[in-house]
Curated annotation (Swiss-Prot):
Keywords attached to this entry: Isomerase, tRNA processing
Protein name per the record: tRNA pseudouridine synthase A
Active site: 55
CDD domains assigned to the protein according to its UniProt record, in alphabetical order: PseudoU_synth_TruA_Archea
Similarity field: Belongs to the tRNA pseudouridine synthase TruA family.
GO biological process, one term: tRNA pseudouridine synthesis
Listed PANTHER family: PSEUDOURIDYLATE SYNTHASE, TRNA PSEUDOURIDINE SYNTHASE-LIKE 1
Biological role stated in the UniProt entry: Formation of pseudouridine at positions 38, 39 and 40 in the anticodon stem and loop of transfer RNAs.
């Protein structure tokens, strides 16, 4: 039996997703609780895997981990796990095939970036956004790791206008390190008149002098991962606990935003 958990988390509370010694990570928090409850013995023995290794500061509304429970699979449900987890919430669980891998089975991933509207030229942003769709060399828009192919295919980039802010949605099967955050910053530069569509086209063909720097990680969230044929089931008490925790964070953030908003109005 193999189980998969859909997890959400507040990225500002962690040094990234992937476990590493001496710092608090999302994987580390989940593994600690699974071991505490006797569901797994170790990540290696129980084939613990994650879908997306989000960077420090990046949040998720839909990431996935999978493992083979040693015993007590009945405890691996949102109600129980969310009672023990901190800054991570289990929103659903699914029993999956033995060969399931959360990264390789993903059909596509959708990221969202939340961007305060600085008076952007939205038509220029959308023109630039359309250039990223398709198969391109993203060397200028990524922090390249040795041996990794810079060619990636992006399925969709949308600029969605909200009241006072924008949501940038980027969808594709796989992404390079910092790729989404650098795409977002390119769109921001286009919206401010600091970057032209022709320059973006050249950069996507591999012609560039300087790379686009990444936007801050705090605005990015892994919004969705599509797994055909797999449904994650939650439970009422577990979801209620998650909603309560997330509302507390929303309330604190809104209070701080209102405070600094009045500062700006006064000065």
């Amino acid at each position: 039996m193999k189980l998969a958990l859909r997890v959400a988390y507040d990225g500002s509370a962690f040094y990234g997703f992937q476990r590493q010694p001496g710092v608090r990570t999302v994987e580390g928090e989940i593994i600690k609780v699974l071991q505490k409850l006797g569901i797994i013995e170790s990540p290696e023995k129980n084939d613990f895997k994650g879908a997306s290794r989000t960077d420090r500061g990046v949040s998720a509304f839909f990431n996935v981990v999978s493992f083979v429970p040693s015993e007590r699979p009945d405890l691996a449900r949102p109600e129980v796990l969310n009672h023990h987890l901190s800054d991570v919430w289990v929103l659903g669980i699914a029993e999956v095939p033995d060969d399931f891998h959360p990264r390789f089975w993903a059909k596509f991933k959708t990221y969202r970036y939340y961007l305060v509207n600085e008076g952007f030229d939205l038509s220029a942003m959308r023109e630039c956004a359309s250039l990223f769709v398709g198969r391109h060399d993203f060397s200028a828009f990524a922090k390249l790791e040795p041996g990794r192919d810079p060619i990636r295919e992006v399925e969709r980039v949308e600029v969605i206008e909200r009241q006072g802010y924008l949501v940038i949605e980027v969808q594709g099967k796989s992404f390079l390190w910092e790729m989404v955050r650098r795409i977002v910053n390119a769109l921001r530069f286009c919206g401010l008149g600091l970057l032209e569509a022709e320059e973006v086209e050249r950069m996507l063909s591999g012609e560039y002098g300087k790379k686009i720097p990444p936007a801050p990680p705090e605005g990015l969230v892994l919004w969705h991962i599509e797994y055909p044929g797999i449904g994650f089931e939650g439970d009422e008490k577990g979801i209620k606990k998650a909603r309560r925790d997330i509302f507390e964070r929303y309330s604190r953030a809104l209070t701080r935003a209102a405070l600094f908003g009045d500062f700006l109005l006064e000065y």
